[in-house]
């Protein structure tokens, strides 16, 4: 077959097996077949020569099904009869490799289209686009594997050890359990990203990553939570969200007993007990266990705030802070108290709130003995003893313990009253004052005195009552 004289089709590069032939192949031979066929098909698609309807053999391979055909289908596919029977022998991986290299033409850059190279940021080498199992990627794998002599670089001296053999990347020394995973990893070193999104132009090294990314462009959110109505683009995100409602935490840390909803979270947490803080900030000398945490921390020093709210323009250092902030605009409060069902926008707030019901005051001031439900309240309280008031008004010079108090104070200068009661229209400078005011409309008085039974709308009123009346 001369590929240069005509259009390459998937039929030109397809090898079919009967059920009997397929069953004689061992797992590593089947994996090799899958790698070659999927890689060739993806290369055809990437240059616009793939079929509009995905071939049945590719569908089967992607779904993990066995791709064998009935014997008459195989004979009718144009494959030579001498290749229709493997003679009962069990092929070695090397034999399968050589046979597939003969039967499945290499789809290289000359066969498809002439493409320019790309420059790898890591090595500054110009590398060809259009990787397939037989041509440029195979060459790269062979040059970066840990053994000698061609295909044995991947499988070792004994081809039967291919399955389960740990393959090593010479560039970063990372180990892999299968050849396909090593190949996928090597694309990163080679800066090869053949799968491009037609909507935004972003490119990916693996097709499944492109498929996942393309869902972010679609407005459709097909996976909906039956409890709260939240919708998600991916089913895995819905499963993760639903654990919030069930409070299921099956994975427990063996060292401290802390429980997690996800196994990966538990594994990452356990590293805290073992790992050294080997990543140090050269600005403040603070140390971290993970390099990713150090990178995030450095943004504090640079002032970089890459995550901006599209509603109000406010920018944040961390994406998680932006997500929390956006709930102010949407009014979303996904975290409910299990006792009184009060809803909160942040998980940490509901955890702190539930401590009010238990009465647990775990944080004690070592100077005066006052106890607090929340650690942040203890930190703020200690400033009373030190006299520290780090937040100063730039208009009148008045200083405050808390930044929130400074913001509230500055509104007295501007006259801004941003919090309005929906019942009577009265406006307030502070959100706290609006919350207290609303209770006059509802008549709600949840804080009862244990001594006389008198009820109050706010906890501060109850505390003041107990000090004035019952502590005499």
Curated annotation (Swiss-Prot):
Record keyword Metal-binding present: yes
A Pfam family hit: zf-C2H2
UniProt entry tagged with the keyword GTP-binding: no
InterPro entries named among the record's database cross-references: C2H2-ZF_Transcription_Reg, KRAB, KRAB_dom_sf, Znf_C2H2_sf, Znf_C2H2_type
GO cellular component, one term: nucleus
Gene Ontology biological process terms, A to Z: regulation of transcription by RNA polymerase II
UniProt-recorded Gene Ontology molecular function terms: DNA-binding transcription factor activity, RNA polymerase II-specific; RNA polymerase II cis-regulatory region sequence-specific DNA binding; zinc ion binding
Zn finger residue spans: C2H2-type: 167-189, 195-217, 223-245, 251-273, 279-301, 307-329, 335-357, 363-385, 391-413, 419-441, 447-470
Transmembrane segments: none
Keywords: DNA-binding, Metal-binding, Nucleus, Repeat, Transcription, Transcription regulation, Zinc, Zinc-finger
PROSITE patterns: KRAB, ZINC_FINGER_C2H2_1, ZINC_FINGER_C2H2_2
Subcellular localization, as worded in the UniProt entry: Nucleus
Annotated ranges, domain KRAB: 8-80
First and last residue of the signal peptide: none
Task performed by this protein: May be involved in transcriptional regulation.
Family according to the record: Belongs to the krueppel C2H2-type zinc-finger protein family.
Protein name stated in the entry: Zinc finger imprinted 3
Organism the protein comes from: Homo sapiens (Human)
């Amino acid at each position: 077959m001369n590929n240069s004289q005509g259009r390459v089709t998937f039929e030109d590069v397809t090898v079919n097996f009967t059920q009997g032939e397929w069953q004689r192949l061992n797992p590593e031979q089947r994996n090799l077949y899958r790698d070659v066929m999927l890689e060739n098909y993806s290369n055809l698609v990437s240059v616009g020569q793939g079929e509009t309807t995905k071939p049945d053999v590719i569908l089967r391979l992607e779904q993990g099904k066995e791709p064998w055909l009935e014997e008459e289908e195989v004979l009718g596919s144009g494959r030579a009869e001498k290749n229709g029977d493997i003679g009962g022998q069990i092929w070695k991986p090397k034999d399968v490799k050589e046979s597939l290299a003969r039967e499945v033409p290499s789809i290289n850059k000359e066969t498809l289209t002439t493409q320019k190279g790309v420059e790898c940021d890591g090595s500054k080498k110009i590398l060809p686009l259009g990787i397939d199992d037989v041509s440029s990627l195979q060459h790269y794998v062979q040059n970066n594997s840990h053994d000698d002599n061609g295909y044995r670089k991947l499988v070792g001296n004994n081809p039967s050890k291919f399955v389960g053999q740990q393959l090593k990347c010479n560039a970063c020394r990372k180990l892999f359990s299968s050849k396909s995973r090593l190949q996928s990893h090597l694309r990163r070193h080679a800066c090869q990203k053949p799968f491009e999104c037609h909507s935004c132009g972003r490119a990916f090294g693996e097709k499944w990553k492109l498929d996942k990314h393309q869902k972010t462009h679609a407005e459709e959110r097909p996976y909906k939570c039956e409890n709260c109505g939240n919708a998600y683009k991916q089913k895995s995100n819905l499963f993760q969200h639903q654990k919030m409602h069930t409070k299921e935490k099956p994975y427990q840390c063996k060292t401290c007993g802390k429980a997690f909803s996800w196994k990966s979270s538990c594994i990452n947490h356990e590293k805290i007990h073992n790992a050294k803080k080997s990543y140090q900030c050269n600005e403040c000398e603070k140390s971290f266990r993970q390099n990713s945490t150090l990178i995030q921390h450095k943004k504090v020093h640079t002032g970089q705030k890459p995550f901006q709210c599209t509603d109000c323009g406010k920018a944040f250092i961390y994406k998680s802070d932006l997500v929390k902030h956006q709930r102010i605009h949407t009014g979303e409060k996904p975290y409910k108290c299990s006792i009184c069902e009060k809803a909160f926008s942040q998980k940490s707030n509901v955890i702190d709130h539930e401590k009010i019901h238990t009465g647990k005051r775990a944080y004690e001031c070592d100077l005066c003995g006052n106890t607090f439900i929340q650690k942040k309240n203890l930190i703020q309280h200690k400033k009373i003893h030190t006299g520290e008031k780090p937040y100063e008004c730039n208009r009148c010079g008045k200083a405050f313990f808390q930044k929130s108090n400074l913001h509230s104070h500055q509104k007295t200068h501007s006259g801004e009253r941003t919090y309005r009661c929906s019942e009577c229209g009265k406006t307030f400078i502070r959100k706290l004052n609006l919350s207290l005011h609303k209770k006059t409309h509802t008549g709600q008085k949840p804080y009862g005195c244990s001594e006389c039974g008198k009820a109050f709308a706010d906890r501060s009123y109850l505390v003041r009552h107990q000090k004035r009346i019952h502590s005499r």
